[in-house]
Amino acid sequence: MASDLRPPEHQVAGHRASADKLGPLVDGEGLFYKPLQAGERGEHEAAFYAAFTAHPAVPPRVRGAFFPRFHGTRFLPAPASPGGAPYPHIVLDDLLAGLPSPCVADVKIGACTWPPRSPDPYVAKCLAKDRETTSALLGFRVSGVRVVDARGGAVWRPDRSELKGIDAAGVRRVLRRYVSTGGGDGLDCALAAAVYGGEGGVLAQLRELKAWFEEQTLYHFYSASILFGYDANAAAAAAPGGGSGGVRVKLVDFAHVDDGDGVIDHNFLGGLCSLIKFIGDIVAEVTEKASSDHS
């Protein structure tokens, strides 16, 4: 099995695995292996997954629909680890397995990305990044994106420095480009109805997730991300009415989750509402244009 492990081809955020750097791996059989982060963060994330998976107050629908399935931890050969010793990895479902031409977006949620009781240097580092990106302004930032053009197979994948410098208008362009085919100005939003709209689309799933966050007081999800995934060919072939059924919306990255202590996670909820507004505006715009084209 170890010989089949490789860095995910479609990774858009985080550290990429190499001979001298630890990073996530996939096995081609539907599993994703995430090396434990250094210090307490990795152990904290593994403990969160174990507790969350068994928590009786988490609705099974929420756990199954919006969180990766947890398969425990496993030591894997890791040349990049100290002394080349086997290194512990969290084992999860590969969220993009089964998508031949995956289009991915990683959106970090929350205007504040550090948990309470964080050391001052870490707070300063997070605060600087939140202010120089759209996190502080919008309550979320796009950390990575990859779009495959279903017609020709060309891949659009802006680098991190490009995403880091965008403003609210830039976020709107990226979210539009994520559901465009690349024709014309590259912002035709031709796949918006299939990906963002409809019963199984991103917008409907985000609204369902929002309903849970309006009630849940178990956890506060600092620096967690929402991952969108869809297959370019399936979306292009979907009916224009929207909702191809293959769109995936998942929460990831839980190294900084804190106890909710009976309080709503307003930081995450606020960012989620902001993201819903941006995507809802795109769906409304596309719907209005389709109506005017047929009138």
From Swiss-Prot:
Keywords: ATP-binding, Kinase, Nucleotide-binding, Transferase
Functional summary from the UniProt entry: Inositol phosphate kinase with a broad substrate specificity.
Species, as recorded: Oryza sativa subsp. japonica
A molecular function GO annotation: ATP binding
Gene Ontology biological-process entries: inositol phosphate biosynthetic process
Name the record gives this protein: Inositol polyphosphate multikinase IPK2
Catalytic activity: 1D-myo-inositol 1,4,5-trisphosphate + 2 ATP = 1D-myo-inositol 1,3,4,5,6-pentakisphosphate + 2 ADP + 2 H(+); 1D-myo-inositol 1,3,4,6-tetrakisphosphate + ATP = 1D-myo-inositol 1,3,4,5,6-pentakisphosphate + ADP + H(+)
GO cellular component: cytoplasm; nucleus
EC number(s) stated in the UniProt entry for this protein: 2.7.1.140, 2.7.1.151
Tissue: Highly expressed in anthers and at lower levels in roots, leaves, flowers and embryos.
Family: Belongs to the inositol phosphokinase (IPK) family.
Region (Disordered): 1-21
